[in-house]
């Protein structure tokens, strides 16, 4: 290891010790101005349809394989199918290549979708900027993305974290804050609840279209890693819609087959020095179910010498001290938490509760029918649990908290915002949460995270339990 890298390690250790000085758990005293959260009207600029006949819209990308050398490009054409091909080339090459995808449509009650295109670009080079074009003729649209560095233990990488976004004025503020944050995210880990179309009469799927156009300014340029939330279920037998997750699965593809997963709702990816596992809070997760069996086999596969950072995404939080959705994730926690502790998961991100909360490293796995132990305890092999369901959707904030604040809860606040996770190396990452009311560089909550496999020191930010 070179002297400069050793110096960075030592600096990170010192900074972590200073930044994570132990204090009591915080219920933020920040007073957010009380305002009704409302969706932006259909004629808002952020929903503008691109000009021209059959112009591609709702462009979004996500990782297209297990290791970061492929990208799924998706878009919608409204007037006719058009072309499903993607033309792409690297920044330093004039040689253009073509990838071909497929087209699908769906109906939902009285709504018929446009033509939804999905095309996977494969065999990309790591750490390379690519330009790509979709559409044909005068309405061709051009975008770009950058592939991640090659997977490795000390590869730095920065993730954005957003959940429960919706398409309100507050949603727009959240996305703007993420875009202008000086800690530049390179990919977004999205913890579920996208469009909130199901809050409209008959689950108005036009609101899936408007949401796709709204987020295109980010999703077309950097991959968003998708997690399904309860607002993606769209199960409405009263109007004849009995196939759960229909709009979500038609519109948003993920690389679940690349890793041997059996369903689109749970899958892993490697990206830089991180191993990301996406789970489904709204699919069966009990013993012997497909998700249970898959996760039981998946966790032992994670090679922490290759990808030191083990991160899990889900929608319903396991540790939640708000009265909203209180203990909804409890049965899933009972099933899977022992595995998380055994395999030393570093961080778990969830949404669902429309507020922000960060826990200490705690577990509640000691109970058996005799000992009666059913209280969370400090556990340095356990993850930090973070609820980031504060994206800004029209349902508003969860302001009612349990009192007193549980000892496992390090920081909580009912404000809209987003977060970033800046992985430095195999031992340290810097996490920060940013509320919408602050300047773009302001951190309302932060901590240095110590990796559980390579540097399992106490990184608590509050006094001991």
Curated annotation (Swiss-Prot):
Gene Ontology terms: cellular component: extracellular region
Q: Which cofactor does it need?
A: Fe cation; Mn(2+); Zn(2+); Cu(2+)
EC number(s) per entry: 3.1.3.2
Reactions mediated catalytically: a phosphate monoester + H2O = an alcohol + phosphate
List where in the cell it is found: Secreted
Residue numbers binding Fe cation: 164, 193, 196, 354
Q: Which residues bear sugar attachments?
A: 110, 138, 172, 303, 400, 425
Q: Which InterPro entries match?
A: Calcineurin-like_PHP_ApaH, Metallo-depent_PP-like, MPP_PAP, PPA-like, Purple_acid_Pase-like_N, Purple_acid_Pase_N, Purple_acid_PPase_C_dom
Pfam families for this protein: Metallophos (PF00149), Metallophos_C (PF14008), Pur_ac_phosph_N (PF16656)
Write down how the cofactor binds this protein.
Binds 1 Fe cation per subunit. Binds 1 Mn(2+) ion per subunit. Can also use Zn(2+), Cu(2+) and Mg(2+) ions.
Sites binding Mn(2+) sit at 193, 230, 315, 352
> What assembly does the database describe for this protein?
Homodimer; disulfide-linked.
Please state what the protein is called.
Purple acid phosphatase 2
């Amino acid at each position: 290891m070179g002297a400069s890298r050793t110096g960075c390690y030592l600096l990170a250790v010192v900074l972590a010790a200073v930044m994570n000085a132990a204090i009591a758990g915080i219920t933020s005293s920040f007073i957010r101005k009380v305002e009704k959260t409302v969706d932006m009207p259909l004629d808002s600029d952020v929903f503008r349809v691109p000009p021209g006949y059959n112009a591609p819209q709702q462009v979004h990308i996500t990782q297209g394989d297990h290791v970061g050398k492929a990208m799924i490009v998706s878009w919608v054409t409204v007037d006719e199918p058009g072309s499903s091909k993607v033309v792409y080339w690297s920044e330093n090459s004039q040689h253009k290549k073509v990838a071909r995808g497929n087209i699908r449509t769906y109906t939902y009650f009285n709504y018929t979708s446009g033509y939804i295109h999905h095309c996977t670009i494969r065999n990309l080079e790591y750490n390379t900027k690519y330009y790509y074009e979709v559409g044909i003729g005068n309405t061709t649209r051009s975008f770009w993305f950058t592939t991640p560095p090659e997977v490795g233990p000390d590869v730095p990488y920065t993730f954005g974290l957003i959940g429960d976004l919706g398409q309100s004025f507050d949603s727009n503020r959240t996305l703007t804050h993420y875009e202008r944050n000086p800690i530049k995210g390179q990919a977004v880990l999205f913890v579920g609840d996208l469009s909130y179309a199901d809050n409209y009469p008959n689950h108005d799927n036009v609101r899936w279209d408007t949401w796709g156009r709204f987020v295109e300014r980010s999703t077309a340029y950097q991959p968003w890693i998708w997690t399904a939330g309860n607002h993606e279920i769209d199960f409405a037998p009263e109007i004849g819609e009995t196939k759960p997750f229909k709009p979500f699965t038609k519109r948003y593809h993920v690389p679940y087959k690349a890793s041997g997963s059996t369903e689109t709702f749970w899958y892993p990816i490697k990206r830089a020095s991180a191993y990301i596992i996406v789970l489904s809070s709204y699919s069966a997760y009990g013993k012997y179910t497909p998700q249970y069996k898959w996760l039981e086999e998946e966790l032992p596969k994670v090679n922490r010498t290759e990808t030191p950072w083990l991160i899990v995404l889900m929608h319903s939080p396991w540790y939640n001290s708000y009265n909203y959705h209180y203990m909804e994730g409890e049965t899933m926690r009972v099933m899977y938490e022992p595995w998380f502790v055994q395999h030393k998961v570093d961080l778990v991100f969830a949404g669902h509760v429309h507020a922000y909360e960060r826990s200490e490293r705690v577990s509640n796995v000691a109970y058996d029918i005799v000992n009666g132990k059913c209280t969370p305890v400090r556990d340095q092999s356990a993850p930090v649990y973070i609820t980031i369901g504060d994206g800004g959707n029209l349902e508003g904030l969860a302001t009612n908290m349990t009192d007193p604040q549980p000892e496992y809860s390090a920081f909580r606040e009912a404000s809209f915002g987003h977060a970033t996770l800046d992985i430095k190396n195999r031992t340290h990452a810097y996490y920060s949460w940013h509320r919408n009311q602050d300047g773009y560089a302001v951190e309302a909550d932060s901590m240095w995270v110590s990796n559980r496999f390579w540097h399992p020191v106490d990184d608590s930010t509050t006094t001991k339990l």
